[in-house]
Amino acid sequence: ASDGSENLLALAVEAARLRATLGEISDALEQKFGRYKAEINTFSGVYSNEMKNDVSFEKAKKLANQFSKNEGRRPRIMIAKMGQDGHDRGAKVVATGYADLGFDVDIGPLFQTAEEAAKQAVENDVHILGVSSLAGGHKTLVPKVINALKAYGRDDIMVIVGGVIPKQDYRYLFDAGTIAVFGPVTKISDTA
């Protein structure tokens, strides 16, 4: 199949008939063709252009600038999409907003595990790990990422959660160690 002369689907079906697992079939294809990796692109200036006369936007920018002066570097946030949550448009909008406020922003790839997100946050030396949750995995994944950060000795990294989070779950997330939870209508500048 690697030369492109045969139908991959037919070959995969035949392999399954011969008792190959889906994982084995996928691994064989990945070894030959590689794994798709989505490119993460963000834009700058869009949020700041729309919010330039907003009081909370200006206040958040001033706070970010003051942080930079005090700490010798800009505040750094990582936006993580963990588990099976592939809804990344909102996370990209949030990332753009934070960048326009003066933050250094890292965006994790889609479908990270809690361990992978924590590792990236530690390696990138972020101040804040923002978990974007739109698929209901917050009660499992957020405690896991907080525990993974603790295992790295980095419980100083603040964890915030944004997305479609039922109000009744907020207390659970706070008890797990989250410092803030933001719903869908929250202004980005108010979260900074």
Region spans (language model):
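Glycine-rich phosphate/diphosphate-binding loops that line cofactor/substrate pockets in enzymes
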Residues: 2-6, 61-74, 119-125
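Conserved beta-strand elements of the Class I
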Residues: 76-78
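Cofactor-cradling patches in redox/metallo enzymes
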Residues: 91-191
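Catalytic-core signal marking the mid-to-C-terminal active-site face
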Residues: 1-16, 21-22, 28
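Terminal amphipathic helices with adjacent charged low-complexity linkers/tails
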Residues: 18-58
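Conserved ATP-binding TGD loop and adjacent catalytic N/P-domain core of P-type ATPases
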Residues: 82
